[in-house]
Each structure stands twice: as C-alpha cells, then as structure tokens.
C-alpha cells in the first residue's frame, strides 16, 4: 500500500481562506505535459509524487484541459462555515444563502475535515475554472491520484466527447450482459437504459447446452422468418399462403421482443460515464501499479477484468502514454 498522506506530524494553526483568494495568490505552474496546477498550505504530498501523478496524463488529453487549473490544498470545504473560524477580510454579515464562497483550509484539522469534500470546482471568471482537491482527505497516493484522474477524465470528456471505437465496444458489452461496471453512475445508467431499476442485477444469460454451445446468444442473434428464399421469376407475383402469414407475424413479434427498448438519454449517460471511468483508470495504471480489486465498492459489482482490459486497450491506442510511462495489464495467477 502506498505511503500515507496523514503523517500525524505537528502542523501550523489552520485557518480558512476563500478559494478565489488561493487562486489569486498561489503560484500556478505547468507540468511538462501541459497540466496547470498549484499547491497551497500543508498538503502532505511530496513533490516527486505530485510530479509523477501530473505527468502521467498523456499530452493528447491535457490539450483539452486548458480551462482548468488544479489546486492541491489540505482541505476544500463543501458548504457554509458559519460555525468555523473564518479569517478573511470580507464582512461577516455578507453571507448570501444562495452563493456561499468556496473555502479552503490551510492545514488539516479534525474540525475542518468534517466539512471537507474530496474536490470542489470554482469558477474563476473569463472561462477559467479552479479544481480544488483535498489532499489530506485522501489516505494514500492511490486515493489522491484516482481523485485527480477522475477530475481530469470528466473535464476531458466534456470537451472531447466519446470516440466511436470506445462507445461501440462498451455498448456491445452491455448488450451481452457483461458482469459489473466501473462506477455506480455507469451501473445505474446502464440499467436505466434497458428499462431496469437503477440498482437491478442484469438477467443472466441462459446456459449453453452441447447443442448450442458454439452459437451466437439469442439476445444478439438476428431473427429470421421461416419463409422460402426461392427466387421469384420476373413478372410473377409472390402470394403468401394463409399458413405463412401467421408465421411472418409471429417472427416479427419475436424479433421485436428480443430487442429491449433503449432509453437513449440514459444510454448516452452510460457511455459518458463508462468512458470517463476508463480514462481515469487508464491514467491511474500509468502512474501506479495497483490491483484491480482495490477499485471494488459495495454499491455495484465490479466490471469483469477481461471487459475492462478491452476498454483500457482502446483508450491506450487513442491516447498513448507519455515517455517514461508504460501501460500494461497483467493477470494474476490463481493459487
């Protein structure tokens, strides 16, 4: 497990500052691959670890992040802080309920951590956005890196969209009822796309028998009517016998029933979630060696490893790693 970011060492007295003030005062730098970033306060993150994480993002992705600057701060607070000691020059009475200012803690304290959030987006004006990431809420490099990469992935998808090669693969996997997903958002939107409850378990495929083991499963097989395929001579008229018409109707109904009605809005949300998840996991794999099981959560079953590997290979082909970084999928041998 990666080293902890919660060092437990004494730190200076923490105070709160408006996020916009941090953005104004902190020295913004740019990594060699083009990520704009800054640090503020007692982050607990070593410079080498931060550089390794930032430089893992392929240049083909950073080109779409021009509007974002990533601020690594001890704690970014999620909401109003009336009960906390705020030290800034703004009048205490000037607290509009609908637009509370985003606040940042200069160091970790238990009190501030109760109101902190993993990250907070702040509009800085002129089309620029600050993404304030709470480094001291993360237990280790794995958690911090994944939080950063998730934010990068969402920003990238918002700007670049979803490649057809990826969406085709993912939708094919969904049609085949592949086990699990990459996030609760992808899991729920996939279920909703097929008209299932958000937390439903997809129906298992019928087990194959010896007779049909090598055939295409019924959910993707093309339905054919049992009409004659004989050629009709030119100038003649084809007349279906009374016995054939019910067969055609039944075949048409069977074909329609075999194709589930798809909610296109939820389908789009599913593909977007699956793509941003896969980009984030791909970036994480470039920055760190980790076991796939570390991504497991209770709310949904984890995507089958072979299905994830297929998605990540598409991502790697689209956005090759930067120099000194390598993408690899290694399968663990069963004991």
Place the predicted regions along the sequence by residue.
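A short mid-domain helix/strand-loop element embedded in enzyme catalytic domains
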Residues: 83, 89-91, 100-136, 174-213, ...
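Pan-zinc metallopeptidase signature
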Residues: 1-32, 209, 218-219, 223-227, ...
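Active-site-flanking alpha-helical
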Residues: 153-161, 280
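Active-site alpha-helix of zinc metalloproteases
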Residues: 141-150, 154-155, 269, 273
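Intrinsic disorder/low-complexity detector
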Residues: 70, 96, 214-216, 231, ...
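Generic structural signal of hydrophobic/aromatic residues within well-ordered alpha-helices
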Residues: 57, 61, 174, 311-315
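Post-HEXXH active-site segment of zinc metalloproteases
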Residues: 142, 146, 158-206, 210-238, ...
């Amino acid at each position: 497990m990666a080293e902890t970011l919660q060092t437990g060492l004494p730190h200076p007295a923490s105070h709160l500052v408006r996020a916009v003030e941090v953005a104004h005062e902190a020295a913004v730098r740019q990594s060699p691959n083009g990520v704009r970033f800054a640090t503020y306060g007692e982050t607990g993150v070593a410079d080498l670890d931060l550089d390794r994480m930032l430089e893992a993002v392929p240049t083909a992705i950073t080109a779409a992040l021009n509007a974002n600057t990533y601020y690594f701060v001890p704690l970014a607070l999620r909401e109003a802080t009336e009960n906390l000691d705020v030290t800034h020059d703004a009048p205490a009475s000037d607290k509009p309920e609908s637009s509370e200012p985003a606040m940042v803690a200069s160091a970790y304290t238990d009190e501030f951590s109760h109101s902190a959030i993993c990250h907070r987006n702040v509009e800085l004006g002129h089309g620029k956005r600050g993404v304030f990431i709470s480094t001291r809420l993360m237990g280790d490099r794995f958690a911090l890196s994944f939080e950063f990469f998730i934010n990068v992935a969402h920003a990238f998808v918002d700007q670049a969209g979803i490649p057809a090669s990826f969406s085709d693969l993912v939708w094919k996997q969904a049609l085949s009822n592949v086990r699990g997903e990459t996030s609760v958002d992808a899991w729920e939107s996939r279920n909703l796309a097929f008209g299932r409850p958000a937390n439903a378990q997809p129906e298992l495929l019928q087990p194959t028998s010896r007779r049909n083991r090598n055939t295409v499963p019924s959910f993707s097989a093309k339905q054919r009517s049992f009409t004659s395929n004989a050629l009709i001579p030119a100038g003649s008229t084809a007349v279906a016998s009374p016995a054939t018409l019910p067969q055609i109707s039944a075949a048409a109904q069977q074909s329609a029933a075999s194709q589930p009605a798809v909610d296109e809005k939820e389908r789009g949300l599913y593909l977007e979630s699956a793509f941003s998840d896969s980009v984030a996991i791909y970036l994480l794999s470039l920055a760190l060696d980790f076991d796939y099981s570390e991504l497991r959560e209770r709310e949904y079953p984890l995507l089958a490893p072979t299905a994830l590997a297929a998605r990540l290979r598409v991502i790697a082909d689209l956005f090759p790693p930067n120099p000194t970084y390598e993408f690899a999928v290694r399968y663990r041998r069963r004991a």
